[in-house]
Design a protein with these regions (language model features):
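Short coil/turn segments at secondary-structure boundaries
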Residues: 51-55, 214-215, 331
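Active-site PLP attachment segment
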Residues: 46, 299-300, 307-363
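Structural motif of enzymes handling amino- and sulfur-group chemistry
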Residues: 354-420
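Walker B catalytic acidic pair
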Residues: 294-295
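N-terminal "arm"/small-domain region of PLP-dependent enzymes with the aminotransferase-like
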Residues: 2-142, 391
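Short, flexible/disordered intra-domain loops and linkers
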Residues: 9-13, 48-56, 135-139, 230-240, ...
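Conserved core of the PLP fold type I
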Residues: 77-287, 298-312, 316
Length: 420
């Protein structure tokens, strides 16, 4: 094929598809090398966190024991875990398996929730047993109770540098950051928070789909890109933004800001000056600016502070566990939204005809649809509303997510983080 013609065709496809095409085009002898190098673009780590996985698999043995305690047929059929007395069974299991890989993390996590959050032992262990065997639909559908507690604490530590704002974050557990992105774009549009032709700002470099999705015919947002093109006196790239570009956020025509922080690529955090400037703009010039921040790489940056820590009222945060724990295959992420937030306020202030449309949309879920939080609307929208009763991330995925969070919370010497 003509080289120039090939280049022209390649310009129109996504970088991820381009990577696959380049691998296919490589000579057989070069394919392994090409795949190793090019797959880095997907952000797929070449390590795993072992302790949370050891705890997960050990908990699986306990879960099966509890099921067989209720019923154990030779055909390979067992019962489902019962709540009453299950904590005492778990404590006995830990004592019997105290030297098994994962036992220490399970015991520490159990004690953490009992001591720090006054968890009822039977309720906690019953949630864990059902989660590890995956015998039920997720209830609550947004995120399991004890998973949410662990992940809330984890986000306060990692996204807020242990200085979270007042109030609590509501969390929605999703099938990785990619699902979170889809749910956010869909629900922003379904709830009239972003409409075709609305102005949004993308801070680039960014994860490529954030650039591609707004161009789809369904959305057709008016996109302004601001580029991290600041240089130092020696002409070196700082991967930071000019004040002039940041000031474009002052326009009320800009409805939303999408930011990947740290950037992806090249993994630079926003400078404190830029962060402070955006916070000032939101407070003084454009108070209705919605901020959607993807902070998956924040755990690799010392003392990281997300927009969810600095201006929680305006911020919707996506965090994925995939990169830090070597877990892209687990599809573990959360959407975090403060209990008091701009998104709920904007929905409440919609024109009457739009509020009536939304009332009809969510009327099968509650007698007062107008009071339904935006984050709960996202859960319903993720399953076309009608399937809301079966919404939610699978129980085993949530169990592993909770153990990932607990592992980081209980690593008081930050040995894992320092190795990263």
């Amino acid at each position: 094929m003509d080289t120039k013609l090939l280049e022209k065709k390649m310009e129109s496809i996504s970088p991820f598809e381009l990577k696959n095409r380049l691998i296919d085009m490589a000579d057989e002898s070069l394919k392994k090398t090409a795949r190793t190098m090019l797959n880095a673009g997907r952000g797929n780590p070449n390590w795993i966190a072992t302790a949370p996985r050891e705890a997960f698999f050990l908990l699986g043995s306990f879960g099966l024991e509890e099921c067989r305690r209720i019923m154990d047929l030779p055909e390979g059929i067992a019962g489902i875990p019962e709540k009453k007395g299950i904590a005492s069974h778990f404590e006995a299991f830990l004592k019997k398996n105290n030297n098994a890989p994962g036992a220490k993390l399970l015991e520490q996590t159990y004690n953490y929730l009992l001591m720090q959050h006054a968890a009822d032992p039977d309720s906690l262990v019953h949630e864990w047993a059902e989660s590890i065997v995956g015998d039920q639909y997720p209830v609550p559908d947004r995120i399991l109770h004890f998973t949410e507690i662990l992940v809330q604490d984890y986000l306060s530590q990692e996204m807020c540098d242990n200085r979270p704002p007042r109030g609590a974050y509501d969390l929605f557990a999703t099938e990785g950051g990619t699902a979170a992105m889809c749910y956010i774009f869909d629900s922003l549009q379904e709830n009239f928070l972003l409409n075709k032709g609305d102005g949004i700002v993308l801070m680039v470099p960014a994860f490529t789909p954030y650039i591609e999705i707004p161009q789809l015919s369904r959305y057709q947002f008016r996109v302004t890109k601001i580029h991290a093109n600041r240089m130092n006196n020696e002409g070196m790239h700082l991967w930071q933004y000019s004040d002039e570009d940041i000031d474009r956020l002052k326009s009320p025509k800009i409805k939303a800001l999408f930011v990947t922080n740290p950037s992806n690529p090249p993994s630079y955090t926003l400078s404190p000056d830029t962060m402070a400037r955006i916070v000032s703009i939101v407070r003084n010039d454009n108070p209705n600016l919605m901020i959607i921040t993807d902070d998956v790489y924040g755990t690799f940056s010392p003392h990281f502070r997300s927009f969810m820590a600095e201006i929680p009222y305006n911020t919707l945060c996506v965090y994925s566990f995939s990169k830090y724990f070597g877990a892209t295959g687990w599809r573990n992420a959360v959407i975090a939204l403060h209990e008091f937030n701009l998104f709920d306020k904007l929905i409440a202030k919609l024109p009457k005809e739009k509020r009536e449309i939304l009332h009809r949309r969510y009327s099968t879920l509650t007698l007062e649809p107008e009071k339904l939080k935006f984050i709960d609307r996202m859960v319903a929208d993720s399953r076309q509303v009608a399937l809301n009763h079966t919404a939610g991330l699978s129980l085993p995925q949530q169990m592993q997510m909770g153990l990932f969070a607990a592992f980081a919370l209980l690593d008081k010497e930050n040995k894992y983080k320092q190795k990263m």
